[in-house]
Regions:
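Helix-coil boundary and interhelical linker segments in multi-pass alpha-helical membrane proteins
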Residues: 2-3, 121-129, 260-274, 314-332, ...
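Structural signature of hydrophobic alpha-helical transmembrane segments
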Residues: 4-15, 80-91, 129-142, 208-221, ...
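Juxtamembrane/interfacial segments at transmembrane-helix boundaries in multi-pass membrane proteins
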Residues: 54-75, 138, 171-229, 234, ...
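C-terminal ends of transmembrane helices
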Residues: 19-28, 95-106, 145-154, 222-237, ...
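Alpha-helical multi-pass transmembrane bundles of energy-transducing inner-membrane proteins
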Residues: 29, 111-115, 119-207, 292-305, ...
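Transmembrane helix-loop-helix hairpins at membrane boundaries of multipass inner-membrane proteins
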Residues: 1-8, 22-111, 194
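Predominantly late transmembrane helices and immediately cytosolic-facing juxtamembrane segments
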Residues: 226, 340-344, 411-445
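Alpha-helical transmembrane segments of multipass membrane proteins
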Residues: 20-24, 96-99, 118-125, 145-146, ...
């Protein structure tokens, strides 16, 4: 117990990865039960982190550091704040529900999901950039395997496009990482890749600009930002159901997390200088993604573009430079992960029963599967930001925070979200209440949800409603991380700008 207390975060990172290796020696049936037990233990370990997290304490918590290769600054250094804590929680919840849901090829999915869970725990906890980059890149491999092995049409093309886009873009970030490590050595006489050490560095204007661009490219493809999103519809729609869930619910959060952890605190002045073009890009994601979603005939592709559109709101919250906006962005990252997981699982159930996701093929499903229709409606309404749902809280706070920074664009973004309601409700009407084409017997006898599906989806609905009605559970620790991040941004921006610090106004909403 003493070891667990001292190294709890390391156990959270490496326990699922080591456990995944044991699954290689198990049967297909046994591996599913094994993966459920491991994922449940991992969730309990993350809840121990939650229980021990002190929102009154400044700085990183559960911090561990071990020198590995001192000469080149490679140290094992992990720690979390309120922002990282809830991405760990999201990761644990999503993986547990996925391993419960999995039906076929249980061993392959169990290994990939547990590996990816540990890798993502490392991404959200690493404070040494070499370890962060290693976890960042390795995360591609389990998803690439799932797409290439179990994907839909054009699975090889979709997998390779996803891999090449994200891998090559990340090489730009790697160049920036290596340069900063070398620059730290020139200034302090030794190399360091610890992000907390890097906060002490100042760069010349020219160097700073290309470093900012290098990091932004590597991060932008992962989110993805417009127009670097062209891999997304292929990967999301052609991946197996659980592959789509992992891509949209978790891997996209790696990008927005990197914006908060690295881009904003390392380059606060350039983040403000390029605020307008980045905000316009995010607005394009919301509007363009909404129109593309409305035009889709395939339900899974529609959900993919809907996910892309909503990530634009997260980006606006990140670049609000105030507590409300950043806290809203982090909350929406969690909410988006829960909602899009529900949407892709529901779409996967449709595909399993009907062997198609073409919206025009469906109709009148609500008659034969009323429970399925009810679950779909609740998740759908959360996706469009219905009040008292988890989707509303994140969108509202993100846009409210961005309104204080850029009122005009915030108003445009807020009104553009109406598109989400239009395309989601239209598709729902067609699938569940539309006219069924004659002779389509497979749809007319559509089977309702079974016990396992009801169990998984009930957890998602509980999260949607409980955290929508009582978001304070998440907002207090998130606010701690947001305030701490803004303090770093303010301190680093003072030598350069006199305006950014005036925008860092902490409006406390937790105690209202």
């Amino acid at each position: 117990m003493q070891f667990l207390h001292a190294h709890l975060l390391s156990v959270v990172i490496f326990f699922p990865m080591l456990s995944a290796l044991l699954a290689f020696f198990m049967s297909d049936q046994a591996s599913r039960a094994y993966a459920i037990v491991i994922a449940l233990i991992e969730l309990l370990l993350v809840l121990l982190l939650w229980h021990g997290f002190d929102i009154q304490t400044a700085g990183m918590q559960f911090e561990e550091m071990k020198e590995l290769i001192y000469q080149i600054g490679v140290n094992y250094h992990v720690g979390i704040d309120g922002i990282a804590l809830f991405l760990l929680l999201l990761n644990a919840i999503v993986v547990l529900l996925c391993v419960i849901y999995v039906k076929e090829h249980r061993k392959d999915f169990a290994i990939c999901l547990l590996l990816l869970e540990g890798i993502l725990m490392g991404v959200f906890s690493s404070l040494n950039m070499i370890f962060f980059y290693a976890f960042w890149e390795i995360s591609l491999l389990p998803v690439l395997y799932l797409i290439g092995r179990f994907g839909r049409n054009h699975k090889i093309y979709s997998g390779m496009k996803f891999f090449l886009y994200t891998f090559l873009a990340s090489l730009c970030m790697l160049l920036g990482i290596l340069y900063i490590g070398h620059d730290y050595a020139n200034n302090y006489g030794m190399m360091s890749f610890d992000i907390l050490d890097w906060y002490q560095l100042n760069f010349s204007s020219e160097v700073k600009t290309w470093l900012f661009v290098a990091f932004l490219i590597g991060i932008a493809v992962k989110i993805p930002l417009f127009p670097l999103h062209t891999w997304l519809p292929y990967a999301y729609s052609n991946a197996p159901t659980l592959g789509s869930v992992m891509l949209s619910a978790l891997l996209s959060k790696m990008g927005t997390y990197a914006l908060l952890r690295f881009l904003l605190p390392l380059f606060p002045e350039l983040s403000e200088i390029y605020l307008t073009p980045i905000a316009i890009v995010a607005l394009c994601m919301i509007i363009y993604g909404g129109f593309l979603a409305y035009a889709q005939k395939d339900l899974k592709t529609l959900i993919a573009y809907s996910s892309f559109s909503h990530m634009g709101v997260v980006v606006l919250g990140v670049f609000s430079f105030n507590v409300e906006g950043i806290s809203g962005a982090v909350f929406m990252m969690f909410a988006h992960g829960v909602i899009v997981m529900g949407l892709f699982l529901l779409a996967g159930i449709l595909e399993e029963r009907a062997s198609s996701l073409e919206i025009a093929r469906f109709g009148s499903i609500a008659k034969s599967a009323p429970i399925f229709a009810a679950f779909f409606m609740i998740v759908l309404m959360a996706n469009v930001g219905m009040p008292l749902s988890i989707g509303f809280v994140g969108e509202f706070l993100s846009l409210l925070g961005f309104f204080a920074t850029y009122p005009l664009l915030a108003i445009i973004a807020g009104t553009s979200i109406i598109l989400s309601a239009i395309y989601m409700l239209t598709s729902y009407k067609d699938v569940f209440f539309g006219n069924l084409k004659a002779g389509n017997n497979q749809i007319s006898v559509f089977e309702d949800l079974n016990a396992r599906e009801v169990g998984v989806l009930s957890v998602i609905l509980a999260l949607i409603l409980i955290l929508g009605i009582y978001p304070k559970i998440l907002l207090k620790p998130i606010e701690q991380g947001s305030r701490q991040l803004l303090e770093v941004i303010e301190i680093r921006s003072l030598p350069f700008l006199g305006s950014l610090d005036t925008k860092i106004k902490e409006v406390s909403y937790v105690n209202r």
